[in-house]
């Protein structure tokens, strides 16, 4: 059997006291420190993950804002393009209306000039007919004399530039 003597008991008590002191002085502070360090590392990892998620959310938000700004830019450019086309179309329509107005006015003026010239020509013809008739009536003469008078009247009118 196993025999226990006093030395063995003292050694056992000394060893247990040494283990107790080691536990209190070295192991416990070491394990406390490692637990504390482990918790600090976990805390830092959690904080880093939290910051990474926040950064990702910020990035997504900025990407969304950039996308919205780009879409707004496209809308503004499209709207500006439509306005420019509208302005050009309106200007073309206005130019077309002015062109038509000017052409109508020119046609009316030409028609008035034509009518005025026709009235003046008719007035001259009537005047000439009256002049010739009065000359013929003044001299009631034969046919030869009549033709001679008409020729003289025509030549006279040609000289004056009325015919």
UniProtKB/Swiss-Prot annotation:
Family recorded in the similarity comment: Belongs to the ATPase B chain family.
Subcellular location: Cell inner membrane
GO CC annotation, single: plasma membrane
Role of this protein: F(1)F(0) ATP synthase produces ATP from ADP in the presence of a proton or sodium gradient. F-type ATPases consist of two structural domains, F(1) containing the extramembraneous catalytic core and F(0) containing the membrane proton channel, linked together by a central stalk and a peripheral stalk. During catalysis, ATP synthesis in the catalytic domain of F(1) is coupled via a rotary mechanism of the central stalk subunits to proton translocation. Component of the F(0) channel, it forms part of the peripheral stalk, linking F(1) to F(0).
Organism field: Petrotoga mobilis (strain DSM 10674 / SJ95)
GO molecular function terms attached to this record: proton-transporting ATP synthase activity, rotational mechanism; proton-transporting ATPase activity, rotational mechanism
Transmembrane segments annotated in the record for this chain: 1-21
Protein name: ATP synthase subunit b
Sorted UniProt keywords: ATP synthesis, Cell inner membrane, Cell membrane, CF(0), Hydrogen ion transport, Ion transport, Membrane, Transmembrane, Transmembrane helix, Transport
Pfam families in alphabetical order: ATP-synt_B (PF00430)
Subunit structure comment from the entry: F-type ATPases have 2 components, F(1) - the catalytic core - and F(0) - the membrane proton channel. F(1) has five subunits: alpha(3), beta(3), gamma(1), delta(1), epsilon(1). F(0) has three main subunits: a(1), b(2) and c(10-14). The alpha and beta chains form an alternating ring which encloses part of the gamma chain. F(1) is attached to F(0) by a central stalk formed by the gamma and epsilon chains, while a peripheral stalk is formed by the delta and b chains.
Membrane topology: Single-pass membrane protein
């Amino acid at each position: 059997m196993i025999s226990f003597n006093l030395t063995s008991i003292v050694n056992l008590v000394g060893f247990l006291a040494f283990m107790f002191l080691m536990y209190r002085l070295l192991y416990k502070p070491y394990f406390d420190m490692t637990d504390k360090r482990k918790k600090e590392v976990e805390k830092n990892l959690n904080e880093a993950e939290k910051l990474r998620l926040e950064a990702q959310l910020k990035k997504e938000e900025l990407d969304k804002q950039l996308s919205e700004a780009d879409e707004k830019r496209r809308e503004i450019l499209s709207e500006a393009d439509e306005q420019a086309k509208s302005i050009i179309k309106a200007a073309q329509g206005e130019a077309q209306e002015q062109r038509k107005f000017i052409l109508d006015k020119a046609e009316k003026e030409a028609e008035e000039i034509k009518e005025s010239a026709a009235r003046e020509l008719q007035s001259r013809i009537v005047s000439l007919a009256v002049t010739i008739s009065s000359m013929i009536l003044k001299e009631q003469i034969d046919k030869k004399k009549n033709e001679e008078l008409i020729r003289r009247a025509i030549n006279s009118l040609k000289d004056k530039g009325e015919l």
